[in-house]
Amino acid sequence: MNLLMEIELMQSKKKNCMYIIIAILAIAALLGFDQWTKHLAVVYLKDKPNIVLIQGVLELEYLENRGAAFGILQNQQWLFAILTVLFLGISFYVFWKVPKTSRYMPIFCVFIVLASGAIGNFIDRLREKYVVDFIYFNLINFPIFNVADIYLTLSVVTIFILILFVYKDEDYDMIFGKRSKDGV
């Protein structure tokens, strides 16, 4: 290996290391904010009347959610644990495979936010056997949710937008390797 190749390899490793450090710090910050808001909900909302922020639109209401979104799959902690670990594994695989260039920065950021939301609710499930929800958008009688749910929802919507309007087949080839003309 010549000197130029060694320098390029070292620069690539340094860049990857920087991205990993940024991702860890960003996840820690987002996760910290999620957990802090849930702590505030426990302290100021549990066993207390709702706090109306905008009459008829937005309230803070404490809820211990033992299910998934919209209250489905109540008390299925083992299923949530398996799905979360699987989901995080896929997220970190994609994160690892995405080229560390400005072209793929949106997907890099989305997976940071996605992982933060998944880990935030996972921590609650492991620690308390339920997730603390506290944001109630009652204008449309939407289910009560939390900051981690916002992270997850925005990430999924953004992924669909990126898939539909930003990234093309060449991008997927770049991330996951060449595919045949059949897409296999």
Label each region the model flagged.
Residues N2-V184:
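Alpha-helical transmembrane bundles and membrane-interface segments of multipass inner-membrane proteins
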